[in-house]
From Swiss-Prot:
Gene that produces this protein: acpP
InterPro entries: ACP, ACP-like_sf, PKS_PP-bd, PP-bd_ACP, Ppantetheine_attach_site
Keywords, in A-Z order: Cytoplasm, Fatty acid biosynthesis, Fatty acid metabolism, Lipid biosynthesis, Lipid metabolism, Phosphopantetheine, Phosphoprotein
Example GO biological process: lipid A biosynthetic process
The protein's name in its UniProt record: Acyl carrier protein
Function recorded in the entry: Carrier of the growing fatty acid chain in fatty acid biosynthesis.
Entry's localization field: Cytoplasm
Amino acid sequence: MDNIEQRVKKIVAEQLGVAEGDIKNESSFVNDLGADSLDTIELVMALEDEFGIEIPDEEAEKITTVQLAIDFAKSKAQG
């Protein structure tokens, strides 16, 4: 597991109150991890803070799984 993946999973665990061990890359924030719309907004804000990036609303709506969050963070970290 690379550093970005670990950081994303740590944020997800903290924001949603779930154990890191229960978080899989394919986990859906809403369907698998029990997030509601406010949770997902707070999650996006935490990711923005952690990685020093801005996630536009139209992009944030597409980030529905842990893997999509990892992929987005990686794309911004490299770009």
